[in-house]
Amino acid sequence: PIQKIYRDGIWQTGGKFSRTWRFADINYALASHEDQRDMFTAYCGALNSLPTDATTKITINNRRLNGADFQRSVLMRERGDSLDSYRREYNRVLTDKAAESNDLIQDKYITVSVARKNMDEARTFFHRVDADLSKNFGRLESGAKALDNQDRLRIFHDFFRPGEEEHFRFDL
């Protein structure tokens, strides 16, 4: 069980602290053989850069695309100007792509957990991990973004309450 949630997205469970990062997919299948080899080497380097004194979990979550979230966060709103025809076309392309994928989205996360004496030590540790992940996943043009508490709790909410994604509320 989670004992304490800190404002910077670090969670405490027993004597361990954890932090989660989201990373984006890379276009591996579309790359040349040489580029694929380079991507694989860089990905291995990113994983090998993770601390050996910590537990690391990679999570791949396939989830249904929520229509309301899709409209709110992905599609462009019309503004009543001369560019609305382009916005409609852009939205049509995105909507068609979403339909082709059976409305499934794949989210990828890395969660690192480590035993530390106190929060200050844990925070120092995670600052170093954050810098390493940002640098190494940046080489892949994938990026790694540390999740805040709202993002982490939303993952749990959406996973355990499919179809109720729009009911998520968080206030710390």
What are these regions (language model features)?
Residues P1-L172:
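Extended, folded cores of ATP/NTP-driven motor/assembly subunits in large transport
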